[in-house]
Amino acid sequence: QMFTNNFDPVAFEIFSLSVRWYSLAYIFGIIFGWLYCKKILIKDDIIQKLFEDYISYLIIGIIIGGRLGYVIFYNFSYFLNNPIEIFMIWNGGMSFHGGLIGIIITTYLFSKKNKTDIFIFLDLVSIAAPIGILFGRISNFINGELVGKVTNSDWGVFFPDYDDKLRHPSQLYEAFLEGIILFILMNLIFFNKNYKIG
């Protein structure tokens, strides 16, 4: 029996405002990534204090960069004709690459302002990032986007909102490889090699 992806992209509604799984993925990714850095990775008291201030820069970079990346890279002509919709992020539409660029820019600005090494914070983000990637790819699967190639395999999935073909659940492959495996590898390097952030 093949699995059919009939998930609703909307997790729940609050006062007629739809809260999507993709939004929750960002929220959970940021929260768990922040907790992991605070409780496990950061040992220096000064960096702990700076990281408290840095997290707001990080969130701004993720949201603005991710949204602008989606607008520019994926649907520029549409948003050029409907500019007000650029601000409607609750309707979905974020870019991983745009978010990455946003993080680098806001991290640079924060480091320059506080006269600290930019690589301290980029290292922390890169070690914790697979947590966010895991949640993000799972939400991609729920949304039925970034689908894989056509397959006849037993674990193929139907994405009825995409087409009527059986496809690889590539989002779950990426969640496993880029989320779980990458997280393990990054942390093995960090802890086994006595790696110093920065």
Name the predicted role of every residue range:
Residues Q1-G198:
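A feature for loop-to-transmembrane-helix boundaries and adjacent hydrophobic helices
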